[in-house]
């Protein structure tokens, strides 16, 4: 059976394949094979460039081009050849080595250097670099731009609605008014920090042999400064070198990435739930598409499905990222293999995040402010001005300011007339009374509008 979106087991490669395809070059089986191949070749090239390893001479132009072409021209057909070797070896990294041994026979200089493919390496030397590069590239090329797009769309909504007054709700109850714009940019302000951390996080990598001590390296070439050579090799690939490891790099860097992703996703979970609530309150309407159906039985329905989809997928993603952070940092003694199958699911976690991010962006594009609903809620909750009145009373030493307003408003439905009657009884300057008399729930928004306009 040919794998299609219809018969794929995972919705990542099925229903949502159009949303996740951008991650395929970084997290597919082909991608892992490609990055392993690249690391093996780059390691071989580093040996050839080291004058203290005479058995691997400096590469001539033909050999350099041949190796470069192996990387740049690598395709699914070549990957299938590696899979054929794996059927014999039952070992995926060894299959890459055998494939390269076979390829080296096609170049006059390289065929005499076959023994130096995978030289002094354990599989984890290759794998940890491959995964680090995959994560780094996926974040830079796909995840970060998508997060930036979401932040941009939320910021735009916030700026558009900077001065649209809104009744706040704390504990689900009416509270001091804010503006819709201010509530939206709050989320962007929160996202900035983890987004920056994600951009700056260094993913450590090791290249120090079977148990991290360069045993085989030193046995073969005791005169070579292997610590320097391997550190230079790892950093040349844009990664951070971890000099102290067991057989495996302990994955603390991947755990850090996972925890940052969870924080980003939790902020977006909070956002999707708030937008869902605002839609439920009628504060936002959603643009309708004529051909779409909201319910199989209720023709009137326009549901917040994009935000609900995002919420579900963010939860799935977080479950995996939390597991990565907890599981990958633990390995028995010098290593056990339980991390291997977990690492193969890195792309699954990023994919669920990406699906959610696309849903958030799509949902944002449908939002239309419903000012009449916002104004109605404000006009029905004049009691929220109690805070302003009692605070002004305190300024002028009006006795029992808080208690007076509590008695007047707590659990009561208060209208403008009730408040104005109360204000007239106060022993505060007439100018202060006049200012309070002008105050309405819609104008009592503090510096919310200015905060949005100043936000960048």
Curated annotation (Swiss-Prot):
The gene is purB. GO terms for molecular function: (S)-2-(5-amino-1-(5-phospho-D-ribosyl)imidazole-4-carboxamido) succinate lyase (fumarate-forming) activity; N6-(1,2-dicarboxyethyl)AMP AMP-lyase (fumarate-forming) activity. N(6)-(1,2-dicarboxyethyl)-AMP binds at residues 15-16, 90-92, 122-123, 247, 296, 301-303, 309, 335, 340-344. PANTHER family: ADENYLOSUCCINATE LYASE. Homotetramer. Residues from neighboring subunits contribute catalytic and substrate-binding residues to each active site. Pathway: Purine metabolism; AMP biosynthesis via de novo pathway; AMP from IMP: step 2/2; Purine metabolism; IMP biosynthesis via de novo pathway; 5-amino-1-(5-phospho-D-ribosyl)imidazole-4-carboxamide from 5-amino-1-(5-phospho-D-ribosyl)imidazole-4-carboxylate: step 2/2. GO terms for cellular component: cytosol. It comes from the Bacteria. This is Adenylosuccinate lyase.
């Amino acid at each position: 059976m040919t794998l299609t979106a219809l018969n794929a087991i995972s919705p990542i490669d099925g229903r949502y394949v159009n949303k996740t395809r951008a991650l395929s070059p970084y997290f597919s089986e082909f991608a892992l094979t490609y990055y392993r191949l690249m690391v093996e070749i780059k390691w071989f090239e580093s040996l050839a460039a080291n004058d203290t390893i005479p058995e691997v001479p400096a590469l001539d132009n033909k050999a350099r081009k041949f190796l470069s072409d192996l990387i740049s021209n690598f395709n699914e057909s070549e990957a299938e050849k590696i899979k054929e070797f794996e059927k014999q070896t039952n070992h995926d990294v060894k299959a890459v080595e055998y494939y390269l041994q076979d390829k080296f026979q096609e170049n006059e200089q390289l065929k005499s250097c076959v023994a130096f493919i995978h030289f002094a390496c354990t599989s984890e030397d290759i794998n940890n670099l491959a995964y680090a590069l995959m994560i780094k590239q996926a974040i830079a090329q796909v995840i970060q731009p998508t997060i930036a797009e979401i932040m941009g769309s939320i910021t735009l909504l916030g700026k558009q609605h900077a001065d649209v007054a809104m009744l706040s709700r704390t504990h689900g109850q009416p509270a001091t008014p804010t503006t819709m714009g201010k509530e939206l940019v709050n989320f962007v302000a929160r996202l900035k920090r983890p987004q920056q951390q994600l951009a700056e996080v260094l993913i450590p990598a090791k290249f120090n042999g079977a148990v991290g001590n360069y045993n085989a390296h030193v046995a073969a070439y005791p005169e070579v400064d292997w610590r320097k050579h391997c550190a230079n090799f790892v950093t040349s690939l844009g990664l951070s070198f971890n000099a102290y490891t067991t057989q495996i790099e302990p994955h603390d860097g991947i755990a850090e990435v996972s925890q940052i992703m969870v924080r980003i996703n939790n902020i977006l979970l909070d956002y999707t739930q708030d937008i869902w609530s605002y839609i439920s309150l009628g504060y936002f309407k959603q643009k309708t598409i004529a051909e779409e159906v909201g319910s199989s039985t209720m023709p009137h329905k326009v549901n917040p499905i994009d935000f609900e989809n995002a919420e579900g997928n963010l939860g799935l993603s977080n479950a995996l990222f939390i597991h990565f952070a907890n599981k990958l940092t633990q390995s028995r003694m010098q290593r056990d293999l339980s991390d291997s199958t977990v690492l193969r699911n890195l792309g699954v976690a990023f994919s669920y995040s990406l699906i959610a991010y696309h849903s958030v962006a799509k949902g944002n594009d449908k939002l239309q402010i419903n000012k009449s609903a916002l104004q109605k809620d404000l006009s029905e909750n004049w009691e929220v001005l109690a805070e302003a009145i009692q605070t002004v009373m305190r300024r002028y030493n009006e006795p029992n300011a808080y208690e007076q307003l509590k008695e007047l408003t707590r659990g009561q439905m208060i209208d403008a007339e009730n408040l104005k009657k109360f204000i007239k009884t106060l022993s505060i300057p007439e100018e202060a009374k006049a200012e309070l008399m002008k105050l309405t729930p819609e104008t009592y928004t503090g510096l919310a509008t200015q905060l949005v306009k100043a936000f960048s």
